[in-house]
Amino acid sequence: MLVSLVLHFSSFIGYAFLRFFLNFDMGFAIFLLLLTVLGAGAAAAWVPVARGGQWLKPLLAFSGAYLFTLTVTHILPEALQLLPEHPTRVGYWVLAGFFGQLLLEVLSQGIEHGHVHHEAAHSPHEGAGRVPFLLLAALVVHSFLEGSILVHSPEVGQVSQNFYAIVVGVALHHMPAAFALATLLRLRLGSFRRVWPGLLIFALASPVGIVISNYVVLSQLLSSGWYAALLGLVAGNFLHVSTTILFETSPEHRLNWPKLAATLAGLALALAVA
């Protein structure tokens, strides 16, 4: 019975993915998300941990500013427009997303914003040979939720119009996360070949979220108001991640010209493409 259910579910998801790829917008989104995660993860095989931080900080500042701007100017307003009679409910979902991300980061150890902790980098024998399943699960939940708001339908207004802008934001955000995850797994497992299964699971989380939202539960999401709640939840998630990134890239609170330039570039790009 269980095997039959698994086979039916697998065939259904496979059919959904086929429809997904036949749609150019969806095909592009899944290709970009897979490429950025797997590409950034592969880079960890050649870039030393110490040198990785040199290019991660400007990229983090850029992606943090981009995500923050996109959330404030488009995702939050659209969530409020979808629930005009109950705007406070959106606020509650934003709070749930913000503080829910705080709890997820206890498990993920901040991998979402490019963290590879000092003790993990310099004590590779601690936890060696073991996959950090809780960390990976937290990352998958985080990534799945981000993918689930990428709905391309006229009924979702600005979110659909800015589909590509949000896809780019998620992809930019996933690059440092994938690099940090691959680095941590390499230190834990001792072989980069053993990194790929975990990296692939992370890479697939957002595409699966997109497929389910667009081809499995779209009508239920739109008719019940749950899509507005989902937007609020992910908006809170994005606000937590983006503000954490922006503050952490300059913990000494001094003027840092490269960080400032990257932040302004992220702000400008989000305003230009959205």
Give the predicted meaning of each segment:
Residues 1-274:
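Intrinsically disordered, metal-sensing/regulatory segments
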